[in-house]
Amino acid sequence: MKFKVIIIILMFVAGPALAAENDALKINAFGTLGLVHSDNDKADFVTTVVQSRGAGYTRDWSGVVDSRLGVQLTYLPTDKLSAVLQVIAEQRDDGVIRPEVEWAYLQYAITPSLSVRIGRTVLPTYLHSQYRKVSYANHWVRPPAEFYVVPVNNSDGISILFNRHFGELNYALHGVFGQGDQDQAGDLRTEAKNTLAVANTFEYGAATLRFAYSQTQLTSKEINELFDVYRLFGSQGSAIADRYNLDDKRLRIFTVGGSYDPGAWFVMSEWSKTKIESFFGNSIAWYVSGGYRLGSVTPYLTYAQTRSAGDGSKQQLDAGSAPPFLAGLANNLNGVLAAMTRPVDQKTITMGVRWDFASNAAFKVQYDHINLDDNSSGVLTNVQPDFKLGDSVNLLSLVVDFTF
């Protein structure tokens, strides 16, 4: 792994030198400078499972939730072969902003309609997966948190891209097979293997329709070590560990999405169902968003919702039947399990305005009202003991997005 990182760094450093000698090398950059404020200081609002610091508990105003800087190198030595390297610096699992590789692949065009990629790519799980971190390309400050919070976003392996025109209808197939891993907040590391993703996209004029399916097998050593403690309580504890641990558990995500953008206005929506036999639990999420372009100013609205889709039953250790010296531990473990399997049900209403004040820069202001369902802490993190379940959270975000 260290050798791979060294090679990537050498490629990154050598890029400018190659650019002086070869016009086939293109360098692009993008970024976001953002601030977000939360009125609830008992939990943090974050945008990914990677982030350990957010707005609310850590700081009422946070500059690390949305801020990032990315650089992409594209090398085209021939009309069939290309290489892409994208590095993004943003907040990582330890709360520090540092660069990591988002894309790193070679692509070969077998035919004008069929290409193969080998290397690291972003999974095509959702409508905006491929460019969700290029905030300038999106009308909102960030994608709905209810929808885009997933354990693994990248895959190291092989991708197949196919497109075909049928008159005015364009069809695109994007398939991925590989593996990967992800460091997450709380000193957790999730390993994904046998990752498979298939996305089908249909475009007709201003309309886009997309169907996608992805699955992977997830393992987390840290999570499994925690649930191994439950096995001290015999068959009851082993049943809990087997149900909720993360030991080669299959995660499946089904998504349907679409958009319509005739120019002056736009609307988009997505629906997804996530299934996994683990503490994550099953869930259903959806959103609808739209806006109207008034010259350089674009006001927009978004409504998003996520809810648990399991059977609602939860197992607990019977502390009363445990030996006296283990009764206290059983109660503590029940508390941990209750927190880990707590519903994430929430609804968010978003209002915002985008102002394109330059050809390559935009200012956005956005207000989010998050309404948590009863007994839910939503997708918030760093939830404190005195956090009120079912409470609401109000966010105010100010960002500047740019590309060059």
Name the predicted role of every residue range:
Residues 2-8:
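Sec-dependent signal peptide recognition
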Residues 10-12:
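Short, linear, compositionally biased motifs with a strong N-terminal bias
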Residues 14-16:
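N-terminal signal peptide c-region/cleavage motif recognized by signal peptidases
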Residues 21-38, 58-182, 192-196, 200-211, ...:
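Outer membrane beta-barrel
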Residues 38-42, 94-97, 125-130, 171, ...:
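Outer-membrane beta-barrel proteins
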Residues 40-42, 58, 107, 228-404:
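Outer-membrane beta-barrel pore domains
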Residues 47-55, 385:
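A solvent-exposed, charged loop/short amphipathic helix patch at secondary-structure junctions
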Residues 110-113, 151-295:
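Signature for the C-terminal beta-barrel architecture of outer-membrane proteins
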